[in-house]
A protein has these predicted regions:
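Conserved ABC transporter NBD signature motif
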Residues: 75-83
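Helix-to-loop junction immediately C-terminal to a conserved catalytic motif
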Residues: 68
């Protein structure tokens, strides 16, 4: 599904492509007493898409959650050059967005209202949006080819369509770093490639640092700029 044509300004611009989006230095992850990752170093630049591959239970979700600030790790994680540990909750919310692997269908909200949730870090305490916020919501729907679904509800949509709406919500959050946990998990093969192609385009054209976990080796090797293997 191609993106719609819509030209609206972004609220702000992120780091230039090629600068570090995610930096890991001596990172160690554990689940209970089991070490999942030990002394790992990696740099993922802006304007790139990287696939995280590995068997079930090797710590892919744990790593993504740690980078999002939702889990614990030793070592250092930097987002756009800044230590994750030094970021406030609001700073983190404007730096990294996270699309989980859960099937989320919000039946009583229109899709544009779901996408508008991504603007929460930028609105006032009652969540009132300005015109710039509404423009970004519209542009986010356009970028994922879902403008015509703006007033529809997710309970009447396919898994692939729902996943696009959740990606649009992450885009509306307007963060330079986007993490996705198994975004192609519930999709058939054609839709897996279509979604991965969309993520690649968003990385290259919007300058995002996109890091996602997947079991689809063909997608990872064929459409991504780099792959990261986690194997314990």
């Amino acid at each position: 599904m191609a993106a719609d044509t819509l030209h609206t300004p972004r609220l702000h611009t992120g780091p230039a492509p090629g600068t570090p989006g995610i930096s890991l230095h001596g990172l160690t992850l554990a689940y209970g007493r089991r070490v999942l990752l030990r002394d790992a170093d990696a740099v993922l630049p802006q304007g790139s898409i990287t696939a995280l591959i590995g068997r079930n239970g090797t710590g892919k979700s744990t790593l993504l959650r740690a980078i999002a600030g939702l889990g614990t790790a030793t070592g250092e994680i930097r987002l756009c050059g800044k230590p994750l540990a030094a970021l406030t909750a609001l700073q983190r919310a404007s730096t990294v967005s996270f699309v989980t692997t859960d099937k989320i269908r919000i039946a009583n909200l229109a899709c544009e209202d779901v996408v508008a949730l991504g603007r929460a870090p930028y609105t006032n305490w009652i969540g009132r949006m300005q015109q710039a916020d509404r423009d970004i919501v519209s542009r986010s729907l356009s970028l994922v080819g879902m403008s015509s679904f703006a007033r529809k509800t997710m309970d009447r949509m396919s898994d692939g369509e729902c996943q696009r709406i959740l990606i649009a919500r992450a885009l509306a959050q307007d963060t330079p770093v986007i993490l996705l946990d198994e975004p192609t998990a519930f999709l058939d093969l054609p839709n897996r490639y279509e979604l991965a192609s969309l993520l690649r385009r968003l990385a290259h054209e919007e300058g995002k640092c996109i890091f996602f976990s997947t079991h689809d080796l063909d997608v990872a090797l064929g459409l991504c700029d780099a792959t990261a293997l986690i194997d314990t």
